[in-house]
Amino acid sequence: MTKPAADASAVLTAEDTLVLASTATPVEMELIMGWLGQQRARHPDSKFDILKLPPRNAPPAALTALVEQLEPGFASSPQSGEDRSIVPVRVIWLPPADRSRAGKVAALLPGRDPYHPSQRQQRRILRTDPRRARVVAGESAKVSELRQQWRDTTVAEHKRDFAQFVSRRALLALARAEYRILGPQYKSPRLVKPEMLASARFRAGLDRIPGATVEDAGKMLDELSTGWSQVSVDLVSVLGRLASRGFDPEFDYDEYQVAAMRAALEAHPAVLLFSHRSYIDGVVVPVAMQDNRLPPVHMFGGINLSFGLMGPLMRRSGMIFIRRNIGNDPLYKYVLKEYVGYVVEKRFNLSWSIEGTRSRTGKMLPPKLGLMSYVADAYLDGRSDDILLQGVSICFDQLHEITEYAAYARGAEKTPEGLRWLYNFIKAQGERNFGKIYVRFPEAVSMRQYLGAPHGELTQDPAAKRLALQKMSFEVAWRILQATPVTATGLVSALLLTTRGTALTLDQLHHTLQDSLDYLERKQSPVSTSALRLRSREGVRAAADALSNGHPVTRVDSGREPVWYIAPDDEHAAAFYRNSVIHAFLETSIVELALAHAKHAEGDRVAAFWAQAMRLRDLLKFDFYFADSTAFRANIAQEMAWHQDWEDHLGVGGNEIDAMLYAKRPLMSDAMLRVFFEAYEIVADVLRDAPPDIGPEELTELALGLGRQFVAQGRVRSSEPVSTLLFATARQVAVDQELIAPAADLAERRVAFRRELRNILRDFDYVEQIARNQFVACEFKARQGRDRI
């Protein structure tokens, strides 16, 4: 028989060693015996015994031989028995180096798994490609060390329980040796259920829950466990490419960010928190880790996605399905919390959406703290000296789901997930080209930095802990936003939405977009490759054409030159793309509105400017992320630095403010923020004669009706603000202003709030008129240039 390759770590050095051989076939035992013969030849004075390691679910009788080998009296003296070294050994089988994508899929078929070949296949491999067989040894441990660990960590007392503990430790050591050869992407937690159920810590917590049983906890662990397999890991990239086949096959990464994250993951476990715009995000993160040969992530997902064949397959590739609405189930909450803690303690990486659900508006939602609090508990309990919160920005040139999101905005119901839904989803990915997927990894946030050292003060102060969690989560989300590149899709959609259905030519699109690109360059904001191409007319044409055919732009070719516009029915879809870039223009838009407000203010206009900037920040805090108030003021001051002696000119007011705004490039507030204040104003109008404690559903229904009336009357500029999604945050604003609760002066305050919003919309009109004057002047200059030619 041809000799297989042996791992460099598979060398025995102790004087008395018990080799635990994990084998499935006689072929594997032959290979291990051959390897053991080499060890004996190298160390003729050492004692090597070999015992077949019982399988995981073996009956108690199968452990008898191991129990005897572990008994102190089995060796020549009790002390020498305790000093005996235990070394687990296994044969691993590597897949063919030239395996195709089809071969990875075929591995799901019975008898085609390259990692677990049949005995007949093993003999053929040894004849034709013996290097595919590797004898590996796990880390050794003395019997005394294992016995101490067993006593310290488990509730068991019987010698057979100790043998089971040693067996589990052997399998875990072999798993670590295996992924060192296969690669970090195959790293996964093993034997989670038996390890946790045997844990003294876990049992102690279980005893504190009334009516809780080990059996029920075990069933919940079965539900949570991933059942990881190498074949499923290989399929992650295949399925990921299938689900995203409408996009460029190569994801767009920042290689410096990837290198920094690789170094960070070598030092600490991490939670990868990704922005969530599409179901595709769930495959983007695992594929991104595989692309860059990084350790895998164990993704949390709703149990509603565990259907058909996809459920088992996704479990085996690292998906952890969790139940919804677990507040009334203390046992499930406890098991989930301990499961998260166990995975973190074993230095495996977790991942979920920081927003908790897909953002159907295109902008980031507030972070959810549920799972984060479990990770924080694990950290504060000392299960890791630090845990990194690694943000992941995922953005797309286009998404087919925007049609669905537009329907939600108009009041449609969510489509339930299932096999038919999955088929239609994957089918839609291949209907056209959606551009690129951009994945960014901003600098990670340290849990230690925000929560202090483990076992610190926060463990005894729930309120302080929650505040620290909120600040930490917002910092992660803020870093995600700062790393998210601005796309051509977002810029073109934002521009065309401002025309309210009026078409623009290629030249008009091109020259108007340049101010935005100049601003992004000055701010050194990240931009996508598609946005960089907007510097050329060809790049603008490509971006506009990619959005054409109602996706969501309409192109008209019947005249002298093509023109592009957004039809009213497509405004909600286009808004998704526009909203995805607002973060890059948020503060400069607030500057414009604060200047417009100061123009009409009495008294100290500089003070009025700052007061209005902070007021706008407060009103928009439910829709957007902001820097803290000190940093925000500094950012606003920096935005104003483009105008020399701006405070002096602002103090003069009148035409000076007109000139300041006319000189500002670009003017973005109307394009970026108007629709949100129109939605707020619709809700404020509904509240004028609504009951004090009106419910959210009734308020939304009334706002939809009134909003449609306002559209018909031209009292709002488009149908875009008539959106259930925008009304949801508008209600939050009203609650924050204490306008949905009984009070003596409620009616007066509701009227005053509506008046305030109308004044802000008046400021939008003022800025919009100046922006229109800029556009006309630019058009006139461009025509003069063309006429001279």
UniProtKB/Swiss-Prot annotation:
Motif segment (HXXXXD motif): 276-281
Disulfide bonds: none
Domain of life: Bacteria
Membrane-protein topology: Peripheral membrane protein
Database matches in SUPFAM superfamilies: Glycerol-3-phosphate (1)-acyltransferase
Subcellular location as annotated: Cell membrane
Name of the top EC class for this enzyme: transferase
A Pfam family this chain is assigned to: GPAT_C
Keyword tags: Acyltransferase, Cell membrane, Lipid biosynthesis, Lipid metabolism, Membrane, Phospholipid biosynthesis, Phospholipid metabolism, Transferase
Catalytic activity reported: sn-glycerol 3-phosphate + an acyl-CoA = a 1-acyl-sn-glycero-3-phosphate + CoA
GO biological process terms, semicolon-separated: CDP-diacylglycerol biosynthetic process
Annotated metabolic or biological route of this protein: Phospholipid metabolism; CDP-diacylglycerol biosynthesis; CDP-diacylglycerol from sn-glycerol 3-phosphate: step 1/3
Protein's UniProt name: Glycerol-3-phosphate acyltransferase
Originating organism: Mycobacterium tuberculosis (strain ATCC 25618 / H37Rv)
Lineage of the species this protein comes from: Bacteria, Bacillati, Actinomycetota, Actinomycetes, Mycobacteriales
